[in-house]
């Protein structure tokens, strides 16, 4: 899971400048008429206006306790009202007024409430984003952008976070299967053997694969070419990886490089073999590029 602060999920700034208050939270004449028409008292008109101006900024309706006092004070003055006690706003929130005001504001701003259609839009946006993105924050940002574009009210961040996490895992599993399903048993057995330190070995086969090739000296050229040949022979036994988007593929390879043999052995089998396939191809590509430059 990721933190809300790593994403574009709208939230209140801790400190607002006077200019920001003026530009974001000043109600226009149409909005003031809207509040006067629906509000029965100063407290109800103020509460309605706070909901209206904050949902315009956030895309969702906050509770009054979460609204910075500077915004409440500014909107109060903008409406030409005297100080309204916070307890009066809380009473409005507890009453039916909150639901009635939210329904009226949604209609006024043409915002769709959170329904099953919202869930469908979230799932679709997450699925499309996860095809090329691996970071949860990036997937969540795509979801937010799409919900705003379609004028949906934003659900709680935790809901977006859970959905993005679940969809990303589903997409990853599909990609992993495209790499592991074609693997013959002989290859997976050799993969497993690479994760165990055999007698006489100083490092595992996996660690040897992870070692990045360096510019070979004249005396090392033969050894280097043998490594390239060995990697090529492996590549012939492995499925291609070009169907996976470059960015996504790069993130998988980055993860594979960070894992040692013990990490891989503890991993779910499907993902383990997929990461090994991807690293084999990445190391071969790097070795071939280096050979063109230095040999």
Indicate where each model-derived feature is located.
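Long amphipathic alpha-helical coiled-coil/heptad-repeat bundle
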Residues: 2-293
